[in-house]
């Protein structure tokens, strides 16, 4: 399960004309390459911050989506010299290398038609739901997002009745609301159920290519926290 959520975002207007005029346009040049600021990255004092160039480039292999009235276009982020400043670029490179090596192996088995092998991933996301009032009483949860003290966990599978057990109405309402929010973003869930520990649950999406799956998982974690807040819950990832 993926636990960490970290993503970057820059918002540009597509109404560039001044003087009170509006002309909606979005050029291909802006889509192919943008120029946000990369001065926040550590450089060891080797360059002035205003000279820290970072470029975004459109990633057409992942799906665009609309969130909060903005068209979100997945991009890669690299330096002026082409070095990766994100985690998407190494992922795309690794997918290309896996495809290249897999096609090479297929050739050894006599397959002469396959040109590319696509990596498919369906990253399940496990999470805990805690009531806000109880969450506020636990300093370890508020500071660290996880428990640092408490009762010892049972080691004899005494809690086997929770796994695949009936989902509580409050949690079921949360899951239903989460599904609807994810559908708006083009993320389809395949499975949802209780997990082994108390208040632990799981959501598994439909398999898609690894690049899009990673992008969608970031959206899943973001929406899990937002939807939980509406239901008086706190989502721990």
Sequence positions of predicted segments:
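Glycine-rich, acidic/polar active-site loops that bind/position phosphate-bearing ligands
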Residues: 11-237
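Single conserved hydrophobic/aromatic residue that forms the stacking wall/gate
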Residues: 1-12
